[in-house]
Amino acid sequence: MEGRKSEDEKNEAALACDVFESSNAKLPKNVFRSSFTWYCYEVINRSAFHIWLLLCLTLIVGWKVFSGIGGRRPSDSNMDGPQTKHKRNPGFLRRHSTIVILVISLAVSFSWEAFKMYRERTFGKQITQFAKEIIKSAPSTDMESWDRVAADFNSYMYENKLWNTEYFFC
């Protein structure tokens, strides 16, 4: 039975290698003009950006509805005291509240996404380096050698503060 199992594993491994080698996939090069255009593409295609955009639009609509865009302005009510012919300058923030809110929301969104992408890029470089180390050590197919690799990776990630605990792989 063990002979049959090892033959099946060899056949599956050979089949996987043949499929991978026969695909001859070529990676696209120079898709983006610069790292900034790549960054914008990544940010726009994330769900967090869409959520922030919807929140910004909701906030802007709510701000305009409650400040009286469709009817009387709250400053025109009798609650403010006697009305004068002299109108006060409402100030930059009041006049351009929509633009200010949109700019602040986009700045927060882009900075948050930039932080997350920086963290992922750093984490990706560490994983690439560790993958090279795995290839150099060439673990066999038994679980004991892979448990050693996982334990080394756990301690490596914990020591470099890439993970909060020593138990990324349990």
From Swiss-Prot:
The keyword Nucleotide-binding does not apply. Keywords: Cell wall biogenesis/degradation, Glycoprotein, Membrane, Transmembrane, Transmembrane helix. Glycans are attached at N45. Disulfide bonds: none annotated. It is a multi-pass membrane protein. It is found in: Membrane. The chain crosses the membrane at residues 51-71, 98-118. GO terms for cellular component: cytosol; membrane. GO terms for biological process: cell wall organization. May be involved in cell wall organization and biogenesis. Belongs to the DUP/COS family. This is Protein ECM34. It comes from Saccharomyces cerevisiae (strain ATCC 204508 / S288c) (Baker's yeast). The lineage of its organism: Eukaryota, Fungi, Dikarya, Ascomycota, Saccharomycotina. The gene is ECM34.
